[in-house]
Amino acid sequence: SGKVTIYWQDGAESFLDPISQEADFEGYRIYGARKTANDDLGEFSLLLEIDLKNDIGYNTGFSTIRIINEFGEPDSILINDTYYHYKFENANIKDGWLNYYAVTAYDQGDPDANLESLESSIYSNRVYVFPGKAAAKENDWVGEPTVYPNPFKGQALWDGYGSRSKMLWFRNLPNEAEIRIFSLAGDLVDIIQHEESYNGADIANIDAQKNPLMAGGEHAWDLITMHDQATASGLYLFTVEDKNSGQIKEGKFLIIK
């Protein structure tokens, strides 16, 4: 099982309520959901609720999510030219599944004005994540590449309808690699070019327009051959070549239909 680390900024804490014109921020809620079979989206579950230490709510404080420096003081982390102040780790989640996450902020409300607490929409900053193994860096490719699910028994639970909505994953890949798939007779079935920035654009079962975040060391395959045919049942062999070092590793997987 893998984990997803969610980072976010503290801008909501200085937001002025449009009605009261006061900075009445109270806390954050983190939600998660997993894509189920045939493109259904499960209900969002509340993973964490955390709020200021005052006379409202649970008074948890932010110490469990705040990014701190070596001296224990509040700090930030720079990721892709953006500074983030908080993080939350969702552990023990299954690799290869599409997960949805959202961070919302909510205010204190105003009992005197008969106003309930307001919360930002879970859809305003929703992100799409495929947990998995990070890419092996140059000259640091440890272990063997593998395939999951293996064996592939007709359909994985994350598959949609139709032969082009099936999907399995190659795992433990270098940051730049070429995957070659062969039949047991030695016939070349498909060639896949992998880069660490892979976003699933070559797979019908992955909506790349939603900019899904991936670990970098995994690549999906739709079980369609290079001749645009569905693969048959059988044992398949594959090689993975590290494009930087030239190192080649081998593996095999079974398709049962």
Where do the PLM segments sit?
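Beta-strand-rich modules
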Residues: 90-112
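Glycine-centered coil/turn sites that cap beta-strands in beta-rich domains
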Residues: 140-180
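Exoplasmic/lumenal beta-rich domain surfaces
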Residues: 22-24, 29-92, 146-149, 157, ...
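Conserved aromatic anchor
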Residues: 2-22, 170
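C-terminal tail/sorting-segment detector
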Residues: 227-229, 233-257
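Beta-strand-rich extracellular modules
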Residues: 104-108, 224, 239-243
